[in-house]
């Protein structure tokens, strides 16, 4: 098979487990990798690697479509989404599909359409994956040079990076267009308990949007996770989309500078490690977002955040005892602090009791009762609306606590229910995946650096014990 470049020249970049230099075939003898090493067998077979990636995309999209339809089939409109263990429908509802005031589901047909579209797309991707894995050319360099590449070709690699950045930027703008022109998105802060609305007054001020990045990650600061209005979220996507698209064009048109050529390792395994590191960071950030943010992840669909459930409990009992005649402004608790209300370290009026630690919670059902100095006593006495009482009672009993056996609630609660918040699942899964992706990043970065330096520590695959054992079949 004709190749356009010397294999010997580039092969040291990948850490192969034996010295074989032939690229034909996908078995251990010809690639140095056994079948279980997966795509490592395809390092120099760009056509087959394309097939593996397209097929993988097909599996992902198939899961999305099938799980989407599964959730639609099991969905009970009378119960909140977070009580039904749903993780996909809340995302569709947040985008404004099928929901009305208060987050009430009015139409499940858009969810059905989403599932079917993903299934159809997965069939197309699956066919493409099978075609390129089994029938298409092994390498793309000869027949389709635009799609071919050599891992060490720095200019080609940054061009591919640029194309990816442009696609990410277009993805960010899809959300912007949905929010501005195509029906709007769900705003949990809309008056009266949330509604779908078009975003009309985008925040584009760089001082506001990039100010989030400069905030402390702790307490009431909360870094970017503290964003609490949709104008900022959609405006942020305008900025990010623009930066990604402009950066993509830049990377397509330019070649890497000398310092970048020297500083970075230029091999397939190095790019894998960079990607895993980025995905790890995304996973950890997503974990914090779904844990604490009730604007991007509205509580109507995902259930309350931990602080929100705690504050809801204090609010619920304040309402109850006030009706029973308690003077909530002056009643003392067992420690001598206020039983229902007290002051924060900075002087605001906040809920008393154990929930004082969550005093900087902001939630749409609570904010109308605040004044310039925290909770307003006169509003608490006169202005509490029935929807606020209903919502806080609901959130109080649905804290995002839970265990692997799906018995939710506080660990010491004897009346525990079979409920685990989607917030718990999404936060935990993204934390665990973020951690494992970070380990993968370290592993592949170490191998890529070792290969670039011309040495590798590891098992000699030519004399591995398993090679002398009888095959399983």
Swiss-Prot record:
Binding residues for [CaMn4O5] cluster: 367
Annotated membrane topology: Multi-pass membrane protein
Subcellular location(s) per record: Plastid, Chloroplast thylakoid membrane
Gene Ontology MF terms: chlorophyll binding; electron transporter, transferring electrons within the cyclic electron transport pathway of photosynthesis activity; metal ion binding
GO CC list: chloroplast thylakoid membrane; photosystem II
Stretches that traverse the bilayer: 69-93, 134-155, 178-200, 255-275, 291-312, 447-471
Residues that bear Phosphothreonine: 15
Propeptide: 1-14
Residue stretches in coiled coil: none
Major place of residence: plastid
SUPFAM superfamilies attached to this UniProt entry: Photosystem II antenna protein-like
Record text on cofactor binding: Binds multiple chlorophylls and provides some of the ligands for the Ca-4Mn-5O cluster of the oxygen-evolving complex. It may also provide a ligand for a Cl- that is required for oxygen evolution. PSII binds additional chlorophylls, carotenoids and specific lipids.
Residues with N-acetylthreonine modification: 15
Cross-referenced InterPro entries: PS_antenna-like (IPR000932), PS_II_antenna-like_sf (IPR036001), PSII_PsbC (IPR005869), PSII_PsbC_sf (IPR044900)
Keywords for the protein's UniProt record, in alphabetical order: Acetylation, Chlorophyll, Chloroplast, Chromophore, Manganese, Membrane, Metal-binding, Phosphoprotein, Photosynthesis, Photosystem II, Plastid, Thylakoid, Transmembrane, Transmembrane helix
UniProt-listed GO biological process terms: photosynthetic electron transport in photosystem II
Similarity section: Belongs to the PsbB/PsbC family. PsbC subfamily.
Complex formation: PSII is composed of 1 copy each of membrane proteins PsbA, PsbB, PsbC, PsbD, PsbE, PsbF, PsbH, PsbI, PsbJ, PsbK, PsbL, PsbM, PsbT, PsbX, PsbY, PsbZ, Psb30/Ycf12, at least 3 peripheral proteins of the oxygen-evolving complex and a large number of cofactors. It forms dimeric complexes.
Function (record text): One of the components of the core complex of photosystem II (PSII). It binds chlorophyll and helps catalyze the primary light-induced photochemical processes of PSII. PSII is a light-driven water:plastoquinone oxidoreductase, using light energy to abstract electrons from H(2)O, generating O(2) and a proton gradient subsequently used for ATP formation.
Name under which the protein is recorded: Photosystem II CP43 reaction center protein
Originating organism: Jasminum nudiflorum (Winter jasmine)
Gene encoding the protein: psbC
